[in-house]
């Protein structure tokens, strides 16, 4: 004889989760970026909490890595912006909402924390744009225009820099006493046509800092 099944609550029964609609690629990429950034920030906090402060070059190197990780995280968020905006998170019926009410409230939070609101307000005031009266398309157009102007200014600066030489420490009197041939060699162009290869890529450096793996 078989046992008759007892009446069970369908909400408490085992439910096979369906992950087909979960943006696993975006979430996994963000998880890795957040993990790297969190580890770097924790390291900086620990170093600054010591009685003896670290050397400035050590702190500068760690800060450079942290800024690179922050930039990489920002690019990843921008890349998956549409996917994340269309994603709706919700707890499964089996989640213990009563025991972990604080955790679920934090995870499902929609409103920004006060610090984030201050960052957004400061960014809006700094860029000088009236975001309330402009549409998203107009704001993106202005941002792209600013990027174009920045690229143009950078190119002009590099072109102007290539016209001058900043090598050598000769005074005007010393240059005047030199022969023409020697004077021609005093200031050679500081722009080299030789393309130097980068010994390490940014991804390899960040992976080494985070995981300690050598190559």
UniProtKB/Swiss-Prot annotation:
One of its GO terms (molecular function) is transcription coregulator activity. GO terms for biological process: regulation of transcription by RNA polymerase II. Pfam families: Med8. It is found in: Nucleus. Keywords: Activator, Coiled coil, Nucleus, Transcription, Transcription regulation. Residues 27-89 form a coiled coil. Gene3D superfamilies: 1.20.58.1710, 6.10.250.2610. One of its GO terms (cellular component) is mediator complex. Component of the Mediator complex, a coactivator involved in the regulated transcription of nearly all RNA polymerase II-dependent genes. Mediator functions as a bridge to convey information from gene-specific regulatory proteins to the basal RNA polymerase II transcription machinery. Mediator is recruited to promoters by direct interactions with regulatory proteins and serves as a scaffold for the assembly of a functional preinitiation complex with RNA polymerase II and the general transcription factors. Component of the Mediator complex. Belongs to the Mediator complex subunit 8 family. This is Mediator of RNA polymerase II transcription subunit 8. It comes from Kluyveromyces lactis (strain ATCC 8585 / CBS 2359 / DSM 70799 / NBRC 1267 / NRRL Y-1140 / WM37). The lineage of its organism: Eukaryota, Fungi, Dikarya, Ascomycota, Saccharomycotina. The gene is MED8.
């Amino acid at each position: 004889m078989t046992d008759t099944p007892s009446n069970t609550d369908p909400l408490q029964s085992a439910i096979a989760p369906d992950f087909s609609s979960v943006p696993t690629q975006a979430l996994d990429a963000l998880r890795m970026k957040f993990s790297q950034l969190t580890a770097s920030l924790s390291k900086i906090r620990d170093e600054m909490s010591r009685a003896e402060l670290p050397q400035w070059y050590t702190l500068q190197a760690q800060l450079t890595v942290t800024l690179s990780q922050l930039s990489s995280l920002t690019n990843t968020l921008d890349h998956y912006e549409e996917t994340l905006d269309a994603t709706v998170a919700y707890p499964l019926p089996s989640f213990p909402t009563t025991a972990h009410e604080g955790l679920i409230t934090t995870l499902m939070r929609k409103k920004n924390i006060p610090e984030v609101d201050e960052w957004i307000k400061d960014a809006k005031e700094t860029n000088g744009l009236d975001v309330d009266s402009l549409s998203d398309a107009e704001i993106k157009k202005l941002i792209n225009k600013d990027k174009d102007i920045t690229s143009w200014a950078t190119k002009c600066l590099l072109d102007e820099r290539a016209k001058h030489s900043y090598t050598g420490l000769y005074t005007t009197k010393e240059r005047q006493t030199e022969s023409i041939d020697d004077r021609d060699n005093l200031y050679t162009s500081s722009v080299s046509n030789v393309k130097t290869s980068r010994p390490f890529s940014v991804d390899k450096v960040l992976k080494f800092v985070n995981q300690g793996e050598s190559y």
